[in-house]
Amino acid sequence: MKRKVFLSVLLALVSLISAAELRIVSGFDRSAFYNALASDNIEEINTQLNAIKTSSLTDKEAFEGALLMKKAGLVAKAKDKLSLFKEGRKKLEASIKKDNENAEYCFLRLIIQEHAPKAVDYRNNIDHDSKLVKSNYKNLPSPVQQAIIDYSKKSKALKGLLP
């Protein structure tokens, strides 16, 4: 009897944990991440890169890779642009290779590919990624859904996602 009561209380407490508290545990705030990814602010991107590195996320490579590629488009030196882009691409693609049906990773790649210069030849997965994002939209966490809504307003590939 005591065990059942304990388990009931434990389940009740676990259900009370909010998304914000879960963010604190992992050290990763998806809303802040997507705000940085949407911005053109290198300081904000660097802040998120540091947050990802110090977080307890097990899948940080995809997020770090996307931010590095975004940062590549904002730095001044061509050498730094190429270096950051290549490093970010390796990280994001490695994550997608491990989990190629992960809609959030494909959304990150879609964002980058739609804005990547033709010279870097990184536009091959736009159709696949947009279909995967559209078909899995409802299963994604709410901060990711909000980022998709915001991004779809200016995306050719996600056009028509919203009614």
Locations of regions flagged by a protein language model:
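TPR/TPR-like (Sel1-like) alpha-helical repeat modules
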Residues: 83, 87-90, 121-139
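Short coil/turn linking the two alpha-helices of tandem helical-hairpin repeats
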Residues: 38, 70-79, 115-120
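N-terminal leader/linker segments that initiate helical-solenoid repeat arrays
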Residues: 21-46, 58, 66-67
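Helix-turn-helix repeat elements of alpha-solenoid scaffolds
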Residues: 35-49, 81-89, 122-123
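Terminal, low-structured helical/coil segments at or just beyond the last alpha-helical repeat
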Residues: 128-163
